[in-house]
Amino acid sequence: MAERSGYRQLQLLQDASLWREYCEARSESSIYLSNLQTHADAVLSRYRDYLGHEFEQVWIDCHDGLHADAIAALCGTVTAGGLLSILLPAESNAMSHRMERFAAKHFAESNIKPYSSVNKTETRSANETLQLTNEQNSIFNALTQSTAKPYETHIITAERGRGKSTLLGQALAQAKEHRSIIVTAPRKANAKVLLQQAPEAHFVAWDKLLEQPGNSEVTLIIDEAAGLPLWATEQLCQKFNPWLLATTVAGYEGCGRGFAVHFTDWARKTLPQVSVHQLTQPLRWPANDPLEQWLTETFLLNEQPVTQFGNRESGTFIKHASELEEALLQQCFQLLLSAHYQSSPNDLNLLLTEPGHKLAYQSTNGEVTAVAWLMSEGPILSPLKEEVRQGQRRPKGNLLPQAIGYFLQQDWAMDLHWLRVARIAVPAAKRRRKAASELLAEIYRWALDNNYQMLGTSFAWSPGLDNFWKKNGYALWRLSSRIDSVSARPAAIYALPLTNEFTELYRVCQLLGQWGQNQLQWLSGGKETLQLTEERNKIRTSLIQAYRSKTIPFDAAHFALAQWFYWQHSNHPLTELLCNSSTTLKHLGEYWGGVSQRQANENLCKEVCLLH
């Protein structure tokens, strides 16, 4: 493929009127995204709609707040010689300073001067057959030769602009005569380039594909696989014959790097034969493109490990991310990225700009051996507190007190100062050495010293994580009966009071811990476990009252209703159905003669009111 000429340029401005003046004179081949301006092409939250497109200029209005995910994603749509122009927030912060600092490093001219022209770039028809580079051709040969190996799976990772989709399209065009092939992606637009190379390809939306019966004779291609929930990708690979899975690894739609680690491990354990390939040579712009270098350094998208930082001091430290030297920040953030599938550049923005967020890390001779992302939450003050309990408000940055105040109807939880362990990560080579537990012990001491009243965490539940947190003193308080669409697991809340065992707070926390444990037993063991619960319980009473008043949904009240009917109304016709943890409103609708789920909920509310 002929390399396009011309380095791409960056423009960062803080003067809104000046930026919009430049924006009005933008190229016809451009896109303008803004949450504030009605004449923009789209709001920032719709940035994913433009992945797979190419523009001479991309204009992003971040005046009301930086959107790092949009910047990272749309940077890859700027063609060679083109321009990325960003209106920075009105008030400078650590992230905007970081953007300007690395702009000064990678662009020789001042990045606050007007951008006057766009270098002309080589254009081509979207349907033109492109000559593959040596790197692409090597992978292409491996892909096409595998047509003789019907159960070989290829995983291809690349940063943006490496010709990944073009390669897949040409491989698909070559192989379609020999196989029945289906293409899927998070959105059809994500597979635009691939489908242009093989216009006869059959595209099916991934959620529709999951509903179809499995067929091992149908070959599957997934483009931008990191944009799908990991469980969905795994199910698709088990239902069909996975041939090609490709994803971008530079941090949008979740973190492609996290996908590459987690999915590749799963694939090698599960699928018959797996080959992993990586594309490194940029094709949409020249090598050493300053805009790509700026993006990589600014948002820490580099995959290369940072082995040591300058300060060789060993120990456990809790600091704001903006206080860390660059190499240390890179180590901490890369560890969080690799350990958590759903990570993104916006995470770095939060760490650098939110004053209540901290990084707790353990280091030995300049190497980070464990890291945790901490968030300060609560208290929630009146009158907002009552609106939260009623489900009318969900104040940003207060996940634990808000969730406990609403889903468990515990008003007092909103009065307290919480420290949430949002994420914790340990390098794979150092796991099972108690580094994470040691870090949690230090976090406990630090929280006590800094006048927090509660520690807590929330995550997608699994038996292993349940065991880990309980070993470290945390108790399960709530397990959602809904399955998360990304993890295919229920969301869980665990908590640990920072008080002695003789206080009223400690006693209430013990009751909530017992409630959560009983709920877990019920979800896994069914009706028989209800005999282990108490005949009368204040938590149950609060939840049933909230359900009667239509404050909380059926899902949040189901366990309380199951207990109540089991103990107080054992002979009621609904008892058997409600004591089954898998019962849904759909089942209740069938019980009432096929009524809608909404009507089934209304009927149940009326029945509870009559019995109460």
UniProtKB/Swiss-Prot annotation:
Keywords: Acyltransferase, ATP-binding, Cytoplasm, Nucleotide-binding, RNA-binding, Transferase, tRNA processing, tRNA-binding. Coiled coil: none annotated. ATP binds at residues 136, 161-170, 284. Its EC number is 2.3.1.193. It comes from the Bacteria. Its main location: cytoplasm. It is found in: Cytoplasm. SUPFAM superfamilies: Acyl-CoA N-acyltransferases (Nat), P-loop containing nucleoside triphosphate hydrolases. Acetyl-CoA binds at residues 424-426. One of its GO terms (biological process) is tRNA wobble cytosine modification. GO terms for cellular component: cytoplasm. It catalyses: cytidine(34) in elongator tRNA(Met) + acetyl-CoA + ATP + H2O = N(4)-acetylcytidine(34) in elongator tRNA(Met) + ADP + phosphate + CoA + H(+). InterPro entries: Acyl_CoA_acyltransferase (IPR016181), GNAT_dom (IPR000182), NAT10/TcmA_helicase (IPR007807), P-loop_NTPase (IPR027417), TmcA/NAT10/Kre33 (IPR032672), TmcA_N (IPR013562), tRNA_acetyltr_TmcA (IPR024914). Residues 319-499 form the N-acetyltransferase domain. GO terms for molecular function: 18S rRNA cytidine N-acetyltransferase activity; ATP binding; tRNA binding; tRNA N4-acetyltransferase activity. Catalyzes the formation of N(4)-acetylcytidine (ac(4)C) at the wobble position of tRNA(Met), by using acetyl-CoA as an acetyl donor and ATP (or GTP). Belongs to the RNA cytidine acetyltransferase family. TmcA subfamily. PANTHER family: N-ACETYLTRANSFERASE 10, RNA CYTIDINE ACETYLTRANSFERASE. This is tRNA(Met) cytidine acetyltransferase TmcA. It comes from Idiomarina loihiensis (strain ATCC BAA-735 / DSM 15497 / L2-TR). The gene is tmcA.
